[in-house]
């Protein structure tokens, strides 16, 4: 069965070009041209991936991303004419998986679509989640086979990537991992983003698992090097 792609862009010529080229690659493609229609379309079609422009009439891309993330975990690639670091970081914090700055190469964008689909829907690598045994860290329990974690018996909702990152750190307890290493290992060698993606995902994780994210007890920063998961007796 063909993968479903939703393209959201208020510039119809761009949406048409993307639709044409994605269909040539064998994808089923659905288009929306404003934020409100985009949310309705995504909820109706439940696509495998979304290409989402930031500048949209109605709701902007950031609002659409936030709304979609309330229910869905499919990869979201942000399309933006802004080459601003704050836009990229904000998009990632809201749950986007990747971003492309306009003007972009259609070939490059399709490569990113394929890479994001492959990473998100393929079986996790053995190194990241090969065990089915529960892992307990203080009051957190990781269930690798169920792709879930609990803290003090309560479920903590993590995205696919957040879980993989936390699980990988748990398998290397106390070892400092550089951002570059985490990007290559958890996101994959074909990921097009930069190490800021790791920082954003760590920040989201801390907000979900730490009692006080500003004074983390689990995921600790080694300044100038990277991150590690603190051991607890």
UniProtKB/Swiss-Prot annotation:
Alphabetized Gene3D superfamilies for the sequence: 3.40.50.2300, 6.10.250.690, Winged helix-like DNA-binding domain superfamily/Winged helix DNA-binding domain
Query: Which keywords accompany this UniProt record?
Result: Activator, Cytoplasm, DNA-binding, Phosphoprotein, Transcription, Transcription regulation, Two-component regulatory system
Q: Where's DNA bound on this chain?
A: 132-231
Q: How is it modified after translation?
A: Phosphorylated by WalK.
What top-level branch of life does the organism fall under?
Answer: Bacteria
**Main location per UniProt?**
cytoplasm
As stated in the Swiss-Prot or TrEMBL entry, residues carrying the post-translational modification 4-aspartylphosphate are 53
Q: Which residue numbers delimit the Response regulatory domain?
A: 4-117
InterPro entries the record matches:
CheY-like_superfamily (IPR011006), OmpR/PhoB-type_DNA-bd (IPR001867), Resp_reg_WalR (IPR047791), Sig_transdc_resp-reg_C-effctor (IPR016032), Sig_transdc_resp-reg_receiver (IPR001789), WalR-like (IPR039420), WH-like_DNA-bd_sf (IPR036388)
Function field: Member of the two-component regulatory system WalK/WalR.
Q: What's the name of the protein?
A: Transcriptional regulatory protein WalR
What is the native source organism of this protein?
A: Staphylococcus haemolyticus (strain JCSC1435)
Lineage per the UniProt record = Bacteria, Bacillati, Bacillota, Bacilli, Bacillales
């Amino acid at each position: 069965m063909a993968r479903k792609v939703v393209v959201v862009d208020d510039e119809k010529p761009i949406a048409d070009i993307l639709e044409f080229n994605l269909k040539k690659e064998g994808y089923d493609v659905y288009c929306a041209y404003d934020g409100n229609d985009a949310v309705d379309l995504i909820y109706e079609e439940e696509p495998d991936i979304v290409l989402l422009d930031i500048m949209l009439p109605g709701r902007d891309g950031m609002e659409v991303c936030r709304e979609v993330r309330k229910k869905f975990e499919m990869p979201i690639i942000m399309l933006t004419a802004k080459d601003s670091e704050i836009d990229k970081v904000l998009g990632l914090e809201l749950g986007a998986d990747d971003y492309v700055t306009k003007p972009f190469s259609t070939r490059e964008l399709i490569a990113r679509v394929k890479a994001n689909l492959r990473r998100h829907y393929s079986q996790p690598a053995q190194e990241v989640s090969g065990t089915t045994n529960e892992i307990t860290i203080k009051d957190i329990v990781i269930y690798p086979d169920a792709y879930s974690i609990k803290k003090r018996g309560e479920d903590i909702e993590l995205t696919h990537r957040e879980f993989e990152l936390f699980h990988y750190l748990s398998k290397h307890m106390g070892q400092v991992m550089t951002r570059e290493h985490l990007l290559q290992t958890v996101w994959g060698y074909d990921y097009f983003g930069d190490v800021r993606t790791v920082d954003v995902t760590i920040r989201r994780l801390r907000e979900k698992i730490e009692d006080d994210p500003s004074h983390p007890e689990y995921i600790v920063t080694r300044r100038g090097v990277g991150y590690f998961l603190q051991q607890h007796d």
